[in-house]
């Protein structure tokens, strides 16, 4: 699996950089690809666990939205408009298939390496840093919804307040429940050591 992760990263990273630019790597889902690849390569239960906390629910939601967009012609959530935009070549849009693979890959990684409970805290720290960095990207891109939320399309106060509220939304409503489920259903890394 290490070599598959390495090969995917070697293909995906330069093509994404060329097509979308460096700012695209501020997206939490792209950060997840990078950290998951490193986690698989280094056999790090901490990195895999943090990305299981951070990416599992988001990628499942992405898959539901992509399916709705492609099959039914309407979106469930904002952010996947590029999927049906013919301006971008189909092959580059198809590289986003990682969203479909990531949930299973992360669960496999947690099963194999164990769920490191520190992954929750690490993912909370990663997300805060990423949300802050996203504020320095183009407001029109609204990367990680750092400028306006995806539901009401508004900013929740000045930049620091909006970033904090966006981060708290993810920490409390996405990461914490995922952490509790992973903690409940998977052994710790010490129990999986051979």
Show the residue positions of the predicted features.
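Alpha-helical transmembrane segments
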Residues: 1-12
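Short, hydrophobic transmembrane alpha-helix segments
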Residues: 13-22
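Hydrophobic/aromatic-rich structural module bridging two neighboring secondary-structure elements via a short loop
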Residues: 28, 33-79
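Hydrophobic cores of alpha-helical transmembrane segments in multi-pass inner/ER membrane proteins
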Residues: 32-41, 94-110, 166-181
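Central hydrophobic cores of alpha-helical transmembrane segments
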Residues: 50-58, 119-130
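Membrane-proximal helix-loop-helix units in multi-pass membrane proteins
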Residues: 61-126
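Membrane-interface transmembrane-helix boundary segments in multi-pass integral membrane proteins
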Residues: 137-175
């Amino acid at each position: 699996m290490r070599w598959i992760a390495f090969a995917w990263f070697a293909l995906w990273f330069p093509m994404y950089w060329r097509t979308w630019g460096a700012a695209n790597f501020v997206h939490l889902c792209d950060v997840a690809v990078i950290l998951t690849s490193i986690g698989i390569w280094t056999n790090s239960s901490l990195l895999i666990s943090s990305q299981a906390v951070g990416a599992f629910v988001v990628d499942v939601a992405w898959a539901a939205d992509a399916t709705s967009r492609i099959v039914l012609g309407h979106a469930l959530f904002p952010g996947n408009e590029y999927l049906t935009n013919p301006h971008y070549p189909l092959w580059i849009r198809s590289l986003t298939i990682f969203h479909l693979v990531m949930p299973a890959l992360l669960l496999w990684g947690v099963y194999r390496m164990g769920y490191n409970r520190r992954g929750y805290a690490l993912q909370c720290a990663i997300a805060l840093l990423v949300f802050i960095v996203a504020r320095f990207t183009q407001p029109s891109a609204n990367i990680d919804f750092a400028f306006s939320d995806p539901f009401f399309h508004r900013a929740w106060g000045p930049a620091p307040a909006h970033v904090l509220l966006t981060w708290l939304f993810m920490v409390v409503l996405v990461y914490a429940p995922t952490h509790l489920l992973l903690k409940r259903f998977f052994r710790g890394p010490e129990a999986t050591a051979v």
